[in-house]
Amino acid sequence: SELRAQLQGTGISVTRNGDNIILNMPSNITFDVDQDAVKPGFYPTLNSVAIVLRKFNRTLIDVNGHTDSTGSLKHNQDLSQRRAESVAGYLGGQGIDQRRMSAVGFGPSQPVASNASEAGRSQNRRVEIQIAPITQS
């Protein structure tokens, strides 16, 4: 709930999946079209994410890039990977230990909406940060 409060009004949705927390960042607020550099206007939001990740430091962080199905599979796969790495790199620059993070591009393989409409394609273009507790073995 601290995370929700921190990210209120940023355009990022926060959902819980079991013990994991998923931050969904729509690409229209995070990146320019077909680009992998984080928009400077999105830095304050990522700074807020970093503050929370530093506080909850017994977690593993998966940064997952996703695209819609427009264009070639290879291009989308590559773009989603670069976007995930871009977000992970920014968080690393904010003091998040890179060893806690993985960045993976999934291209169009995990849609959350239909690619038949622009609204659906827009939902599919996203970066998700999944935060999972480190379990003691």
Predicted regions and their residues:
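Periplasmic peptidoglycan-binding/anchoring modules of Gram-negative envelope and division proteins
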Residues: R4-G11, T30-G65, G89-G93, S122, ...
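Periplasmic OmpA-like peptidoglycan-binding domain that tethers envelope proteins to the cell wall
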Residues: N64-Q136
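Membrane-engaging insertion elements
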Residues: S1-I21
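Short low-complexity stretches enriched in small and charged residues
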Residues: G18-I21, N57-R58, R82-V87
